[in-house]
Structures are given as structure tokens and as C-alpha cells.
Amino acid sequence: MRLSEIGQQLRAFRLESGMRADEIAARLGVSRAALYRYEKGEVIKLDTVQRLAELLKVSPLTLLGIGVEYYSRPLSFFERVRQVEEEADQILQISDPVAYLVTSPEYDSILARAIAEQVENKQLIEQYQEIFTARRESYRLRRPTMITMLSEQSIERFLQRGVGEAITMSDELRTEARKVAAMEIGRIAELIEAEPIGLQFSLLADVESTTNCILMRGRERMMLAINPFRCDMSPAATTGVSLVTSAPEAVNAHQRVIEVLWAESCKGKEAAERLRSLLAQHAIQ
């Protein structure tokens, strides 16, 4: 494992712990500047790795990238996904009702307003927004191949409830959130018809339950992320545990399932027409 990867995981686990950088540095007996250097990929001693693992309540092997990484906070999970995406050449995913990396600025705007009504921790909100902005910008610059499968059931709920489905918001904001949801689904239909190079969507029509997962293939390895956290949920939510791993047995099993689902899913003109039918049935008028 490269030192930069240890640094990336250190940052993700620091966010997962909820501890401040200066608090962790003080407990380790190092400066905050030294901690940030570790996160940037500078050499870190094994005894420091051991103390960090104990402090962050993770296995030293996990901190070194061997085993399974678990995250119970959306903030830390999406930070880890951001790190892996930055080195991925191909992304395969069973996703939310949208593929966040190709959503519009309006999606971010309405979500930020909804979160601001519920979360008082401004720093948490800013960190969350920075991570998602960085994810989209990285995709825009690198353009990895992306294949996304969307569940029809989740799209129906998305159109009925709008962006931020699980976030409590005013009736006025909920109406706006539904309008943005309809716009996003309309954009996906247009993207399907336009067939841009390296970007594909399909619909899962008859699948009652799927686990959101992302396979990210880089030059050296493939990483799997299993995710209960939707990209339009509050950063303060603690309703699940996500995981990230490069274990071959987990990666291969999920890859086989994704390949079967992709082969059986609705694609192309048929998928675009189905999305427009869902818009006509469920979108706000």
C-alpha cells in the first residue's frame, strides 16, 4: 500500500471518529501539522500507526488498507469514496435515484437549503459540501467511465418526495425539492438518449430490493463500497454502517451480481421512455 493511501484512510477515519485534528494530535503527542503531513502521505512510523488505530478504534491492519473499512457517518464514508474515485478509471454502481457525479448545481443548492434547516453544525455542513463538490469536480476533470443502474422504485419515491427525501423540510421547500427531482430525472433521460462516451444508465424494473454499491476500478486494484447512505441525506444522519474493501471475494461476488443486473436491465430508448412515463405519473405538476 502506498503512503498516500494510508494518509487518505487516516483522514477518513479521523472524520469518522468525530474528533478534531488538534485533539488527535495532542493524544498522539505530535503536532497538528505532523498529523496533516501524515494525511498527505508522509512517512509514518508503525508505532504511530498502532497508537492511531487504538485512538480511532480501528484495526491497525484496516488503517494500513488490509481488511474491511467500516463507516457509520455519511461524512467519512463519502470522503473515502472521493479518495477512491480520484484514482478510478471505471465506476460501476447500483445507485440512488440519480448518479451524483452528473447532477446539476440545482441539486446541491436545494439539498444545502434543506440541510441548513435541520443541522446547526455549520462546519459539518461545509465539510459535507466540500466533499461532494470535490467529487463532482474530479469527475469533470478525469471523466472515468461510469455505468449506473437505477431502481424504478427509488425513482418513483424520489419524484414523489423530492431531493432530501428523509430530511424534514417546509412544504414550500418540499415543493421546490420535487421540482428539482423532476429536473434531474429529465436530465438522465436526455443523457440516455444522447449516449455520451463513457456514461451509461439503465433501469432496474422488477428488482424489489438492491443494495446500493459502487465498484471502482483503478490501475492497481478494484475497490467495493457498500452504502446505506444516500447522497441527499443529512450529514448528521447515523442510520447505517457502510463499508469499503478491496477483498477479492467481496469484489468478485458483487461484480458478478452487477453484470447480471446490467444484462437484464432496461437500457437505451426504452429506458428513456420509461423515465418520461414515471415523470408523467409521479412528478409534481
Question: Over which residues does each language-model region extend?
Answer:
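Alpha-helix boundary/interfacial micro-motifs
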Residues: 30, 49-51, 56-59, 74-78, ...
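Short, surface-exposed, charged/polar-biased interaction segments
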Residues: 31, 45-46, 56-59, 70-73, ...
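Short, charged recognition helix plus adjacent turn
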Residues: 66-97
